[in-house]
């Protein structure tokens, strides 16, 4: 070869040289050379094809490597499925190369090719009808021989084979001749003659029988049947024989051909192939019709008239009914002709079970009792039935799976994946060939019913006839029904027996998903059970290849002529009986047993019992059934077997009782767990309960929450059902049921809207069930609320959703009168509740939560009808009786007696919580107040001028009460469930309420209203936190957990434990993004107060209330900071209710950066003011008030409330548009450590209080004044308990920093502060007119304050505050309506960077500031300004104890009389529409203000750089006063206007960038109306 190549190369080089003329000389040599090269190439190809398997394998691997490299850099990257497709192709190549490596050298003869193909075919699986294995064999053939591939492609291709099977009818004949199978051909039938039968030749019979011949144990796989595609043999024209069974019903026969089709060629692969449905579907292979026609032909008398019908493939199901030689015996010299019908157009999905019955005897009687290959094919005949043989039989045989030892684990996994992928692809391709279209049985919604259920339904329908479900491969489930044999024939199955055969198909898990665990093969009275891939329980040593001696059987009387069968040598004939439909026989009656023998053939062990026939145990049945379910689910969803194992172990289907009764009364297994596992009784019980719950979930197919919500729509179950269920099943574990109930309560808590504070007797008595908008507090049954406190616990605050759920369910039931429980049922309510959960688990009905809610509602409904004493007595009796209601008969082994008692007590308290749903402390308070009748009646005639939810704080250390209430201004009813208002009273009210050491922090979450009520027990502090929304559009007004003092001019005090009560109120607006916070606590020596926006005005005293609330000299305590309107407006408001909407506004501190969505603040209505902080984290107000007094609500107040609610609507309409906001900010630098002095105009100092103020505006017709809000009278006991409480910056409200008296005065801080307080004390106790002298307006003198009580409080408080502290003076400055806006924004510029530690500097600053302010404000706007008597200081973040001097501004009427009032650093006050301001908020430093004040027009807007507009209100043209001359330059150097900047973060109240404030030289220009240039 090398010489030839060298010769050719040399001549080629010579001929290709440029100067060579050789091409012209010898052209023939070139042709010869080319021909030689072509021959060499062909020779090389032949050597490559027929080289050794090792070389071929190496070449293929190299080929694959090159292909892989090409794929990596190929051009198909854009194709979505290209990589996966290439991966599958690569795996397929590996599989084929592996199979080729195991094959012997192939000879060139066709016979050798077939044997080699059979060898590889056996390697895959012995199943002759496996489409996937045939495809693999065909691929092997393609690789082995290109020539044979051309002829064999139509026969080995799955698609071609199924196509060739369509619309083809054939007749096979057999003759005694020895014609080889290769000569098999088909011939047409004579047209004039009757339809000839299907005939096979004996040689073909012999050849095909070799497929099922016995084989040694070491060679369990059968040989591959010969493909006779390329070889024909003539038909034997022996007389045809008639089939002994009737034809199919006419409506299932599409047509009966009168003549045969032209001569056709069919291969065995075509015969073995499937139809157009699932290619690897064993269900089609085991179809009764198909199996009868293909595998079994009955012995036919030759004298019968011939009949034939032609069967072709229908497009939706199995195709050609084929006749195989398995129905004949092996060997023999002669043969008899047999015929099988071929029927065309059968729709297997519509064939009734009765129509297949005639196939059954033919399928069974065509076998010999000792012919094992026929048994093997017979088991394929019958459908899967795991429970058709549940009668007193048990399985006696399981097989040993065949192991292919020469295959590694990786190879087996590769084979399995390849088979699955190929099968899935073929299934999809053959079932419609549409993208995403899968057969109905492969869809997820196709329910996989239990085989026993189908068997039961069919058995009931057809009496003794059994129907067998059929399991398909890859999850396909198709039910075909086959009935018992015809009943009118004699049976010679007496010599037969019930056989148990277990099969194994090929590799482990390779084809196990295509087969099914149990198949019942029935033969007369005997049945053979075939089990696939089961667990072996018989040893191999019991196997014996010896066949039993054959038994001669008599001919049936129904057959006119016997049919002699040709059997192998050494065997006697065995004939079978064909039965008719009229005489069904029981398939479970076993007759004469035969000796035990075990035959292993084709990888299948046939194990038959020796003495008795037994069926599978229920546990084994469950195991086999779930084995198939696992494969089905894996093929459907691709879930791993580990995930499916939990379903197999814990969720087996329950046995069907009807099937058990039909199957010789086999008892239902006690344990529902498959297998005999060593489980203890306790674990078994838990598993059973778990399985019950899982079964309920699977039955409903819905999540638990959805199921519970659906169960709410069902009618109420009767009590008798509960009791019956309890008697049947018994009560459950107490702890288990209670835990489940608690879980259900948590899950169902958010199902319906609810509000805990909207309870009323209307809801309980079903008078107003559908009204969920709120209920009046006055209608709440007090006797219901005031039952004994021992019936509830402070831990047991019932979820408000329970009550609403109860009401909703009662509303759905619609029958109030017929559902009440008696006294006896009430006593047994706890026991009934224990059984409700068990009923829910076992019956899947309504949850126990709904039942218990109904019970609670029924019990509570009768409460308002009875007196308080009766209810209390009844509750006590109920509690006593409930001690005997708890069912403890079922002992809980794992709980001690103490824990069981605790559980019982918890159940009792939980029930009472369900009934009452109120905190213990609230009940105690109401009980005490209820007992004080004289105290409650004393408040019955109070007027309601205004409202302010009053929260007091006595000791910030002991407790803080936060109330975030939902406040509405358009409500129709005012619900104050847990609050008792203290109405307007001319004298202080004392209450002997003793709440010593009682404080709860109670938290209740409501998903709808976002109500948060927290109660916790602290040492002696009663705190409550309620979080709600301020909704301006809702229809109810809740002031929960707060005790408002409405329009009170005097403080209502409680002398008992006043120092241990305090509240911190927060009004949080989720709707408007507004937050109203009022923190009344003692922190850093200051005190502030925020009245809530509630307003209640009596219609009778309406005019007087308006006058009193707006024109009093000293405002009511709860209206701190509320000013008086001009005299003209007050006169007009007497006759106009709309004036109640409040022409006076108080705009508190607002966090503008966090109120971008809605910037309008919560404004006070009808003489009340509110403080709003948008984000609940930056604003707090602290103020000391006496502890709250709980006064019972007067029933007459409902009329007053209803009258006020209508007026509140008017207020809302008028103030719906955004109002301008006045902000009171604090420029605390670096930290809030500097204690601020809370100095009141009346001289109240609250010591170490918080850091916030409220700007209060008072409009006077004669001028503008800054009125200090009224401070509460703080008793000595309260003040002595006050301690510094350091709130975080996010909690403390932003407020101007006040100077320390000790630091500014240079002396003793405590003494200086105390003296200053003493100086301001007489001012505090005097009216505004007294403070101002003759310059005060007459309206301020109308109602003088109670000086005695106030002085007493202030003296005691000043004695206690003898330490360094900061006192604030909260003042209010406002311009009269029509006057210019006076933005006295005060702060210190660069001068304040110096530390004022000496008295001299402080005195100088104070003097200069006072002179400047008096001159500036007094001349310009008619306001006398008195500088503070003490220096102010700012702490500067430079590491030094520097201070912030603060200018205190006192705005007086035009007379300009000096006063001692001090204004905070930013007092921007105005009327409702007299100014316009735009506040831009800076981020890290104080904002710079530009303010223009012109003498002839209104003040322009106040601006701040680098911020956002907080509010703008367009001013109206108003007359203005003359401009004020320039102030003293000395004082100007001390003052710089600072905008009430809004903090931008939680730490923004602390501004450390003091140099950014405007400088000294800019003050004169600013105060004269100039603008500031931005400073840096």
UniProtKB/Swiss-Prot annotation:
<comment type="function">
    <text>May play a role in spermatogenesis.</text>
</comment>
<feature type="region of interest" description="Disordered">
    <location>
        <begin position="170"/>
        <end position="197"/>
    </location>
</feature>
<feature type="region of interest" description="Disordered">
    <location>
        <begin position="1293"/>
        <end position="1347"/>
    </location>
</feature>
<keyword id="KW-1133">Transmembrane helix</keyword>
<keyword id="KW-0221">Differentiation</keyword>
<dbReference type="InterPro" id="IPR027970">
    <property type="entry name" value="SPATA31F3-like"/>
</dbReference>
<dbReference type="GO" id="GO:0030154">
    <property type="term" value="P:cell differentiation"/>
</dbReference>
<feature type="region of interest" description="Disordered">
    <location>
        <begin position="542"/>
        <end position="572"/>
    </location>
</feature>
<keyword id="KW-0812">Transmembrane</keyword>
<dbReference type="GO" id="GO:0016020">
    <property type="term" value="C:membrane"/>
</dbReference>
<keyword id="KW-0744">Spermatogenesis</keyword>
<comment type="similarity">
    <text>Belongs to the SPATA31 family.</text>
</comment>
<feature type="compositionally biased region" description="Pro residues">
    <location>
        <begin position="546"/>
        <end position="565"/>
    </location>
</feature>
<feature type="region of interest" description="Disordered">
    <location>
        <begin position="782"/>
        <end position="801"/>
    </location>
</feature>
<dbReference type="GO" id="GO:0007283">
    <property type="term" value="P:spermatogenesis"/>
</dbReference>
<protein>
    <recommendedName>
        <fullName>Spermatogenesis-associated protein 31D1</fullName>
    </recommendedName>
</protein>
<feature type="compositionally biased region" description="Polar residues">
    <location>
        <begin position="966"/>
        <end position="980"/>
    </location>
</feature>
<dbReference type="InterPro" id="IPR039509">
    <property type="entry name" value="SPATA31"/>
</dbReference>
<feature type="region of interest" description="Disordered">
    <location>
        <begin position="952"/>
        <end position="1033"/>
    </location>
</feature>
<feature type="compositionally biased region" description="Polar residues">
    <location>
        <begin position="1020"/>
        <end position="1032"/>
    </location>
</feature>
<dbReference type="Pfam" id="PF14650">
    <property type="entry name" value="FAM75"/>
</dbReference>
<dbReference type="Pfam" id="PF15371">
    <property type="entry name" value="DUF4599"/>
</dbReference>
<keyword id="KW-0472">Membrane</keyword>
<feature type="compositionally biased region" description="Basic and acidic residues">
    <location>
        <begin position="1004"/>
        <end position="1019"/>
    </location>
</feature>
<feature type="transmembrane region" description="Helical">
    <location>
        <begin position="29"/>
        <end position="49"/>
    </location>
</feature>
